[in-house]
Design a protein with these regions (language model features):
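N-terminal Sec-dependent signal peptide, specifically the hydrophobic helical h-region
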Residues: 1-28
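Solvent-exposed loop/turn motifs of extracellular immunoglobulin-like beta-sandwich domains
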Residues: 3-6, 32-41, 48, 73-77, ...
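N-terminal V-set
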Residues: 21, 45-68
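Generic structural detector for well-ordered beta-strands
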Residues: 31-33, 41-43, 68, 81, ...
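Eukaryotic short linear interaction motifs
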Residues: 49, 60-61, 70, 88-90, ...
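Extracellular/luminal immunoglobulin-like beta-sandwich modules
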Residues: 52, 93-122
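Eukaryotic helix-linker segments that join adjacent hydrophobic helices
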Residues: 54-59, 67-85
């Protein structure tokens, strides 16, 4: 019983002092011209999990010269840089996600969907 109380106290103290991860800035509506570059912001306080992105409900991988991290993930910047914007591939609803800080925590983050509009050719 004493071990359980000490363990529970440690978990509570860790959560209070370290804080749970939470969005500082979530992605919002953006527009970009075809062939342009746009940054979808996503900044997280107390980030311990892994940054991920989805477009229209499908996971998006990082690809050099197309989808790249814009900031330092270790410091909580999960922002995504979309290069060479293309209406076929990039137009849609994007979500920033951060996995739980560990398997015992329920602090997974999933942003509201943010629409990225690739403008049509004039």
């Amino acid at each position: 019983m004493a071990l359980w109380v000490v363990t529970l106290s440690s978990l509570v103290m860790t959560s209070v002092f370290a804080g749970l991860q939470e969005f500082r800035e979530a992605p919002t509506y953006r527009e970009v011209n075809p062939g342009g570059t746009v940054v979808l912001p996503c900044r997280v306080v107390n980030k311990l999990g892994e940054c991920r992105w989805e477009k229209d409900g499908t996971p998006v991988g990082m690809y050099r010269d197309k989808y790249e991290w814009d900031g330092d993930q270790a410091s909580g910047d999960c922002s995504l840089r979309v290069k060479e914007a293309n209406i076929e591939y990039d137009n849609g609803v994007w979500q920033c996600q951060v996995t739980a800080s560990d398997f015992t925590q329920q602090d997974t983050l999933i942003s509201e969907g943010a629409e990225l509009v690739v403008r049509g050719e004039p």
